């Protein structure tokens, strides 16, 4: 049994080492000759007009969060629907409670205005 853990440990160490090597190689091998032209933001070859760094609206984050919640619901709902007949009444009640919890969350997000575009 300890052989299995040793194999997992070795695989973990190798995976971490490969990631570290891949992250450090560009820093070690890339040329380091910063010139003012390279440090300017690129906008299709045109000079920038106004501020280059603009704020990011948090509404997009809220949309992504709500989308992720309902996407996860779909991931859980699909296998349940495929094996609905074998699972019985308990699984139906469990999935009903799951959907009710998600609908309450959706209602709360709607009530708080998280789903308004602007």
From Swiss-Prot:
Gene Ontology terms, MF aspect = NADH dehydrogenase (ubiquinone) activity; NADH:ubiquinone reductase (non-electrogenic) activity; quinone binding
* Enzyme Commission number(s): 7.1.1.-
Among its keywords, does the record have Signal? no
| Membrane protein topology class | Multi-pass membrane protein
Q: Which GO terms describe its cellular component?
A: NADH dehydrogenase complex; plasma membrane
Which key words tag this protein in UniProt? Cell membrane, Membrane, NAD, Quinone, Translocase, Transmembrane, Transmembrane helix, Transport
Q: Where are the transmembrane segments?
A: 5-25, 61-81, 90-110
Q: Which InterPro entries match?
A: NAD(P)H_OxRDtase_bac/plastid, NADH_UbQ/plastoQ_OxRdtase_su3, NDAH_ubi_oxred_su3_sf
Where is the protein situated, by its record's location annotation? Cell membrane
| Cytoplasm among keywords | no
Can you state which reaction this protein catalyses?
A: a quinone + NADH + 5 H(+)(in) = a quinol + NAD(+) + 4 H(+)(out)
Q: Which family does it belong to?
A: Belongs to the complex I subunit 3 family.
Per the entry, what this protein does is: NDH-1 shuttles electrons from NADH, via FMN and iron-sulfur (Fe-S) centers, to quinones in the respiratory chain. The immediate electron acceptor for the enzyme in this species is believed to be a menaquinone. Couples the redox reaction to proton translocation (for every two electrons transferred, four hydrogen ions are translocated across the cytoplasmic membrane), and thus conserves the redox energy in a proton gradient.
| Record text on subunit structure and interactions | NDH-1 is composed of 14 different subunits. Subunits NuoA, H, J, K, L, M, N constitute the membrane sector of the complex.
The name this protein goes by in its record: NADH-quinone oxidoreductase subunit A
